[in-house]
From Swiss-Prot:
It is found in: Cytoplasm. The modification Phosphoserine is found at residues 152, 393. Residues 1-52, 129-170, 385-477 are annotated as: Disordered. The gene is CACNB3. This is Voltage-dependent L-type calcium channel subunit beta-3. Residues 195-345 are annotated as: Mediates interaction with the alpha subunit.
């Protein structure tokens, strides 16, 4: 009776049940593949984490200054989740090594900055293109038509802005240690400016002994603009018009500064031709600009007049240079030394450089970090100055600032004669330090009586000698 009866849906249910049985192996294989992929992902992330840890003990390969902002927390493609770097435009990064085409390993140059994954220029360019495509897809046609109706800027200006926007790279390669450059209170080559800056050079040489390289640069570094060095046509034009420095000489000096910075020592430039921050703004040096500021023009005039008629003849030029520096916005400088006393100005600069030193040196223990460059693993083959032992190479001896003894010797006076003649010949002691020849002894050969950081038993004695021989103006300004 029921054999020929039809039960609706029975065949379908049977078929569905059969299909479910046959589809189970496929589901199991999908789960297995997903587990394999997850296992492989965890293995890759573990290896990336290990490489990140090993990079902490590696030397800095090079440094960059950022032109864009980036948030690593939002990047899901970071090799180790949560280990992506965050930075803003104009930050500085130390690059340790290349992880892949899309990622570097390095750290943000700041106190306590940890090792992290850094997007390579290729990855940042890829992110930028994706953002542009997304913006085009979400663009409103009506708004695009409105732009045509608005008053547009001149074509030349619009093209110039578009060209600048297109050619700005995400990173600029800069020295591993930003070189320190002093400007002010007026023009270099004149006695007041030279004697005030020399007092700071002498202080830094003693205060950061073993951690600093002070080198003189006579080439015109303002010619080292990236657009000039990368454009053969512009190089030829400037080569013909420049009597002071050739482009080849400038390029050589830039390379030498980069090599000095590889040691991760502080680098201070005694740059003869740099008197304004704008001169170095478009170079790849990314310097720390220190403004030695006299707060009152009347005080500067009095100081110039006190140096005699030879300096009075150039009073107008020096005051014009002073005015240009004072008119600069404060953000043009990294440090402004406007203290009334030499000791206060020195301590201000020293505090800034100590913070910068800690920012550039990773807190993790590294072998030879505070020692000479030759003691840092992996850097010996990179040194411009060659193999270094107890003594400096001839090139380094030529580049370092002369010691106090050499400066005194070049002025044909011994320290004993200086002390005897000091009472009535203060103004005659000064010899512009920019007239020195390069064949001077190493700056590391200090006489004990000239040290600022001597033992406690000799501290007061040395402090008195330094106060007596300092070339800083006696005026309180």
């Amino acid at each position: 009776m029921y054999e020929d009866s039809y039960v609706p849906g029975f065949e379908d249910s049977e078929a569905g049940s059969a299909d479910s049985y046959t589809s189970r192996p496929s589901l199991d294989s999908d789960v297995s593949l997903e587990e394999d992929r997850e296992s492989a992902r965890r293995e890759v992330e573990s290896q990336a984490q290990q490489q990140l840890e090993r990079a902490k003990h590696k030397p800095v390969a090079f440094a960059v200054r950022t032109n864009v902002s980036y948030c690593g927390v939002l990047d899901e493609e970071c090799p180790v989740q949560g280990s992506g770097i965050n930075f803003e435009a104009k930050d500085f990064l130390h690059i340790k090594e290349k992880y892949s085409n899309d990622w570097w390993i390095g750290r943000l140059v700041k106190e306590g900055g940890d090792i992290a994954f850094i997007p390579s220029p290729q990855r940042l360019e890829s992110i930028r293109l994706k953002q542009e495509q997304k913006a085009r897809r979400s663009g409103n046609p009506s708004s695009l038509s409105d732009i045509g109706n608005r008053r547009s800027p001149p074509p030349s200006l619009a093209k110039q802005k578009q060209k600048q926007a297109e050619h700005v790279p995400p990173y600029d390669v800069v020295p591993s240690m930003r070189p320190v450059v002093l400007v002010g209170p007026s023009l270099k080559g004149y006695e007041v400016t030279d004697m005030m800056q020399k007092a700071l050079f002498d202080f830094l040489k003693h205060r950061f002994d073993g951690r600093i390289s002070i080198t003189r640069v006579t080439a015109d570094l303002s010619l080292a603009k990236r657009s000039v060095l990368n454009n053969p046509g512009k190089r030829t034009i400037i080569e013909r018009s420049s009597a002071r420095s050739s482009i080849a000489e400038v390029q050589s000096e830039i390379e030498r500064i980069f090599e000095l910075a590889k040691s991760l020592q502080l680098v201070v430039l005694d740059a003869d031709t740099i008197n304004h921050p704008a001169q170095l703004a478009k170079t790849s040096l990314a310097p720390i600009i220190v403004f030695v500021k006299v707060s009152s023009p009347k005080v500067l005039q009095r100081l110039i007049r006190s140096r005699g008629k030879s300096q009075m003849k150039h009073l107008t030029v020096q005051m014009m240079a002073y005015d240009k520096l004072v008119q600069c916005p404060p953000e043009s400088f990294d440090v402004i030394l406007d203290e009334n006393q030499l000791e206060d100005a020195c301590e201000h600069l020293a505090e800034y450089l100590e913070v910068y030193w800690r920012a550039t040196h990773h807190p993790a223990p590294g072998p030879g970090l505070l020692g000479p460059p030759s003691a840092i693993p992996g850097l010996q083959s990179q040194q411009l100055l060659g193999e270094r032992g107890e003594e400096h190479s001839p090139l380094e001896r030529d580049s370092l600032m002369p010691s106090d003894e050499a400066w005194t010797g070049s002025s044909q006076r011994s320290s004993r004669h200086l002390e005897e003649d000091y009472a009535d010949a203060y103004q005659d002691l000064y010899q512009p330090h920019r007239q020195h020849t390069s064949g001077l002894p190493s700056a590391n050969g200090h006489d004990p009586q000239d040290r600022l950081l001597a033992q406690d038993s000799e501290h007061n004695h040395n402090d008195r000698n330094w106060q007596r021989n300092r070339p800083w103006p006696k005026d309180s300004y």
